[in-house]
């Protein structure tokens, strides 16, 4: 952060995190309360079609940007970075330091990084350091113990959930705003 603040004293510096979550037609089962003697039903039929949710989060403010896709690879992630930078004003209005894990499509070789974005990789096998990991239980809530006929039905529910979470910045900040997470730096 200090390095970016030195390079760009006229722009705010923000720290964001990103991660991906794979959802499919394989049901998510959770415990539920039921009257004594009754067993709750949760339909399920394992099918292997996937929906990927990519989230970018600014934990200190609870701001999120969500993308849904049917797959992930390095060219697609590069395009996501480009769209994210454009939508958030990175480079033009602010500098974003983006923390991400070491997934294969995040590796720096041949990954074009847009102006205004600086990638910072977390240590290997440390998901507990990734604030975006804490978004997935929130995304999964409306999916638990539900049966979806098609991936489109699942996508509709997930898209609505992501929209709902966009408006609940306090909830996002509570789940992702670790006490040690760096705060934004205002321009000098």
Language-model region placement:
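Short functional hotspots at interaction and active-site rims
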Residues: 1-188
